């Protein structure tokens, strides 16, 4: 009996190996990009670390800026240079505008019925248009300036309490910044702040968990026969919890707005409900889609902004000369006791250079949201078949020494002075928010918040990290996820300037 089982196992393994070899031989005729040797069944999954952007960059240094990997049976094109990114997101933008289906998106975002993950087409265009017209256009972004100012001032008051004593106490700056971004997006999108203690829901934790889930690699997604591993890892349970909790929260928010005075509608939910009730339009906004728009606003408005502010403050405290130079610019441009306005922040050259450098070195989403080819395409002389997923490694591109110089790994805002380089997606060596049709539509909203926040906390306080005496270096460990936060909170000590 044992010999029969052993024979069956060996036969199965040999069959898989033979199938893999035959498939690899057959694909040679397609003139595919360079690819590392892959294992049967799992493909190249064994070559990925928890910090996928780093392992993909290491592979690209060996196999080139355009390489083909296989996640299980799924072919995935990895883009790691500005030149190839230009071809993907400009030359072939329309062919590369679709999104692949994923387990997390299917479960939490109704199969990609939101803006960020919806398939390219009329539905996506209508949803994106609703977001831009009602929240993300320049006029709307400017109209929320007072909300941003009020919440930043509240944050400064909290920090002043920690800094005013003769012995300033450490603060969890990560948590303070998370509360700031969450409160602002709640007021803008939902009309009021939602506190976990007061309202019985921890929105901040849900957003963090969801951002982490989006960066997961569910084994069952690429190897269906091993989907049981996701259950053992607790991935399926996490998705269930996030989906249930946030849906309950959004149901309550929508109900509150439906029962409120309809004559005073002004926030995003109010506007979405007005659109939903209008049956004369060409596009009917379903309730589920309405909630998914709010989901996107939380992910983009809270997660990406927090990630930037966390890492920007980390780099400034690691580079005291840069911090001092920035403080000198801000403090000389604005009286110490006054709030730095958004217009003032926009005119501060070194501040803008610091923002660009932080986005270059620490893009909130190191790997841009994956795309999938809708038809065959030719890239750099290689033939890429339809259905291939495309991942642009913005983190690797923005640290490429061939375009940024030998000091690309260093935090040097000076590299952005006296240049017209911006992050609007037109220069493909600097694409922290993507480019082309699927560029992040919330760039303006995020930009308005990060500049004024950074200006005011750097102006009002002197900062240093709360580092244990025995530690020589600052902790720069990254969390995992689509949006990459610090793994451990940024604990810092503010002192009055």
Swiss-Prot record:
Q: What class of enzyme is it?
A: oxidoreductase
Question: A single GO CC term, please?
Answer: membrane
User: Which keywords does the record carry?
Assistant: Heme, Iron, Membrane, Metal-binding, Monooxygenase, Oxidoreductase, Transmembrane, Transmembrane helix
Q: Where in the cell is it found?
A: Membrane
Q: Where are the transmembrane segments?
A: 3-23
Output the Pfam families linked to this UniProt entry: p450
Q: Does the record carry Thylakoid as a key word?
A: no
Quote the CDD domains the UniProt record gives: CYP71-like (cd11072)
Broad class of the protein's primary localization: membrane
Keyword Signal belongs to the record: no
Specify the protein's topology with respect to the membrane.
Single-pass membrane protein
- Cofactor (UniProt): heme
Listed GO MF terms: heme binding; iron ion binding; monooxygenase activity; oxidoreductase activity, acting on paired donors, with incorporation or reduction of molecular oxygen
InterPro entries per the record? Answer: Cyt_P450, Cyt_P450_CS, Cyt_P450_E_grp-I, Cyt_P450_sf
Residues the record lists as binding heme = 440
Q: Which Gene3D superfamilies does the entry mention?
A: Cytochrome P450
The family note in this entry says: Belongs to the cytochrome P450 family.
Q: Which PANTHER family match?
A: CYTOCHROME P450 71A2-LIKE, CYTOCHROME P450 FAMILY 71 PROTEIN
Q: What protein am I looking at?
A: Cytochrome P450 71A20
Provide the species name. Answer: Arabidopsis thaliana
């Amino acid at each position: 009996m044992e010999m029969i089982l052993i024979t069956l196992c060996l036969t199965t393994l040999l069959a898989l190996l033979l199938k893999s070899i035959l498939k690899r031989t057959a694909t040679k005729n397609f003139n595919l990009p360079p690819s590392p040797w892959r294992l049967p069944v799992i493909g190249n999954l064994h070559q990925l670390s928890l910090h996928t952007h780093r392992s993909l960059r290491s592979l690209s240094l060996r196999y080139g800026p355009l390489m083909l990997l296989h996640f299980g049976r799924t072919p995935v094109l990895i883009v790691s240079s500005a030149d190839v990114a230009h071809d993907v997101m400009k030359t072939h933008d329309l062919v590369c505008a679709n999104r692949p289906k994923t387990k997390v998106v299917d479960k939490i975002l109704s199969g990609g019925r939101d803006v960020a993950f919806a398939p390219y087409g009329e539905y996506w265009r209508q949803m994106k248009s609703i977001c831009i017209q009602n929240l993300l256009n320049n006029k709307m972004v400017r109209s929320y300036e007072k909300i941003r100012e009020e919440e930043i001032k509240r944050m400064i008051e909290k920090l002043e309490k920690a800094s005013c004593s003769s012995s300033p106490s450490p603060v969890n700056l990560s948590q303070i910044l998370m509360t700031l971004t969450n409160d602002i997006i709640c007021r803008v999108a939902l009309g009021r702040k939602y506190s976990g203690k007061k309202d019985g829901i921890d929105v901040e934790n849900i957003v963090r968990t969801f951002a982490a889930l989006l960066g997961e690699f569910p084994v069952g997604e690429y190897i269906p026969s091993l989907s049981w591993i996701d259950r053992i890892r607790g991935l399926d349970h996490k998705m269930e919890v996030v989906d249930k909790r946030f849906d309950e929260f959004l149901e309550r928010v929508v109900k509150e707005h439906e029962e409120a005075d309809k004559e005073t509608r002004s926030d995003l939910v109010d506007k979405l409900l007005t659109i939903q009730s209008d049956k004369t339009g060409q596009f009917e906004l379903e309730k589920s889609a309405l909630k998914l728009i709010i989901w996107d606003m939380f992910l983009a408005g809270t997660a990406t902004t927090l990630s930037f502010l966390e890492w920007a403050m980390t780099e400034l405290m690691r580079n005291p000369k840069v911090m001092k130079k920035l403080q000198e610019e801000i403090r000389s441009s604005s009286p110490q006791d006054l709030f730095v306005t958004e217009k003032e922040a926009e005119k501060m050259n070194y501040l803008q250079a610091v923002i660009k450098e932080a986005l270059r070195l620490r893009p909130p989403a190191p790997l841009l949201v994956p795309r999938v080819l809708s038809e065959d395409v030719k890239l750099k002389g290689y033939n890429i078949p339809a259905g291939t997923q495309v991942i642009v490694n913005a983190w690797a591109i923005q640290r490429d020494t061939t375009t940024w110089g030998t000091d690309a790994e260093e935090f040097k805002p000076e590299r952005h002075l006296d240049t017209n380089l911006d992050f609007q997606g037109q220069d493909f060596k600097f694409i922290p928010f993507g480019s082309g049709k699927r560029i992040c539509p919330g760039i303006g909203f995020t930009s308005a918040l990060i500049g004024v926040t950074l200006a005011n906390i750097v102006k009002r306080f002197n900062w240093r990290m709360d580092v244990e005496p025995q530690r020589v270096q600052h902790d720069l460990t990254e969390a995992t996820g689509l949006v990459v936060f610090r793994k451990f909170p940024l604990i810092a000590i503010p002192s009055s300037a």
